[in-house]
UniProtKB/Swiss-Prot annotation:
<keyword id="KW-0813">Transport</keyword>
<keyword id="KW-0288">FMN</keyword>
<dbReference type="InterPro" id="IPR029758">
    <property type="entry name" value="CysJ_Proteobact"/>
</dbReference>
<dbReference type="GO" id="GO:0000103">
    <property type="term" value="P:sulfate assimilation"/>
</dbReference>
<keyword id="KW-0249">Electron transport</keyword>
<comment type="subunit">
    <text>Alpha(8)-beta(8). The alpha component is a flavoprotein, the beta component is a hemoprotein.</text>
</comment>
<dbReference type="Pfam" id="PF00667">
    <property type="entry name" value="FAD_binding_1"/>
</dbReference>
<feature type="binding site">
    <location>
        <position position="356"/>
    </location>
    <ligand>
        <name>FAD</name>
    </ligand>
</feature>
<feature type="domain" description="FAD-binding FR-type">
    <location>
        <begin position="234"/>
        <end position="448"/>
    </location>
</feature>
<protein>
    <recommendedName>
        <fullName>Sulfite reductase [NADPH] flavoprotein alpha-component</fullName>
        <ecNumber>1.8.1.2</ecNumber>
    </recommendedName>
</protein>
<dbReference type="InterPro" id="IPR017938">
    <property type="entry name" value="Riboflavin_synthase-like_b-brl"/>
</dbReference>
<dbReference type="GO" id="GO:0010181">
    <property type="term" value="F:FMN binding"/>
</dbReference>
<feature type="binding site">
    <location>
        <begin position="386"/>
        <end position="389"/>
    </location>
    <ligand>
        <name>FAD</name>
    </ligand>
</feature>
<dbReference type="InterPro" id="IPR001433">
    <property type="entry name" value="OxRdtase_FAD/NAD-bd"/>
</dbReference>
<comment type="similarity">
    <text>In the N-terminal section; belongs to the flavodoxin family.</text>
</comment>
<dbReference type="Pfam" id="PF00175">
    <property type="entry name" value="NAD_binding_1"/>
</dbReference>
<comment type="pathway">
    <text>Sulfur metabolism; hydrogen sulfide biosynthesis; hydrogen sulfide from sulfite (NADPH route): step 1/1.</text>
</comment>
Amino acid sequence: MTTQVPPSALLPLNPEQLARLQAATTDLTPTQLAWVSGYFWGVLNQQPAALAATPAPAAEMPGITIISASQTGNARRVAEALRDDLLAAKLNVKLVNAGDYKFKQIASEKLLIVVTSTQGEGEPPEEAVALHKFLFSKKAPKLENTAFAVFSLGDSSYEFFCQSGKDFDSKLAELGGERLLDRVDADVEYQAAASEWRARVVDALKSRAPVAAPSQSVATGTVNEIHTSPYSKDAPLAASLSVNQKITGRNSEKDVRHIEIDLGDSGLRYQPGDALGVWYQNDPALVKELVELLWLKGDEPVTVEGKTLPLNEALQWHFELTVNTANIVENYATLTRSETLLPLVGDKAKLQHYAATTPIVDMVRFSPAQLDAEALINLLRPLTPRLYSIASSQAEVENEVHVTVGVVRYDVEGRARAGGASSFLADRVEEEGEVRVFIEHNDNFRLPTNPETPVIMIGPGTGIAPFRAFMQQRAADEAPGKNWLFFGNPHFTEDFLYQVEWQRYVKEGVLTRIDLAWSRDQKEKIYVQDKLREQGAELWRWINDGAHIYVCGDANRMAKDVEQALLEVIAEFGGMDTEAADEFLSELRVERRYQRDVY
């Protein structure tokens, strides 16, 4: 960065302001300067009047565009780190959310980087669905003048590992793009792979990308809004659990908990639509069982991230024990030469099925072997936090955050098993006990900025959580817009989550309509998608009145069934064929009128 000051006549600052700016930035590193540049761009982006008053810059040289397609925040963090690396190398770079990207301009991109995660059964993140559809449609342009690279994040415990990245990579090449680098598919522990890939990208682009002129604003893009907080995924807040209340009935097949966490005077802020990240500890009883099955001792030393820890502590705090993966099964089979597991090696479908139905501890029980402690540690994946849709608004609950947790419980040959994070919150954290948390902001699941806009909320099961936050916010704002909730669960008497609250909102006129689907209260199973079809005419009227549609919950089945029902309603009552209805719903997505938080 140059320290030479342009003539004062060309500056929008007076001498005193310029002196203060120079003093404030003297000791900053290039990466810090890049962040500050992006921060002030974000501040400016929130002030349309100031932005409009700024003279149009001279036509700038084409630079690098990074598209961030994130579901849980990891892809966004990688994209932001790459942006900072490129800015530090004095390269002209723009970072945009996939949901904000004007994808019809993709043909004009010269240097394009895509950082994407995968959700559901190989689908792109919600914010990238429209871009993905466009690239795979007949409207996609040739990209013969575009060089690109793709970094894909995923979880190898799922069958369609990194599928979204594979899709983008193959389609960009098919459209004529030139690969700068081979695609990288990163697993849950992605940091080392991302760091190496970022360095390779910077090296590859240095010879191809224009260096930003000193007078240019190199931070020409940012990811929506700048969130500043001392707490993050890597530096969580030590909060305390204040309420743990079961909100399903005694005879329900589901154990759903309403959890309230006290944030104290931390100043941690969130918005309706955000998620709460929870770092949990594994059950000590599960750790003990696994250690004993392998004939190990809990006090044996192991090395974790350069530190020496007792095996018990390492397993309880640092490694994933409740989710098995095909890679773990394959590696355990190879390591132990298990006669039961070796026949599965090489058969992806069988490995996936075994991993999905057999927890790690039961894999060891069924195929016992003797491993040393370090071999066990090397076999496992690092523990990662779980994300829960926030079920509260700070306009009502202030220094608290609420979540709705479906506790995972099941048996394996008569032995009780449970989900790591859900059982931690439900069973092992005492009242006022410590819970390490952070906020994962989700700018792709937000209430309309206009309080008069109607809202349609579709959230069966624990998918109801963010809509409780929405209603608290709409009530606090005295928003005049209509609100319509679709909720479903097996039984009315046992599974009507937050029933009293919804009844109060209806009585007070905050909740205009509520449609309920109970799948097991009658012979015929009824789901929320059936209620959507049943109310199709009225639903179409709301959509025509500008309503925003929100869907939260299961990505693999519910979200697909709901989307199909919406397409049928649009086609029938909008007088469209299937293709036109799909295009209409895609436009709603681009306009942020159709938003999903699915998992």
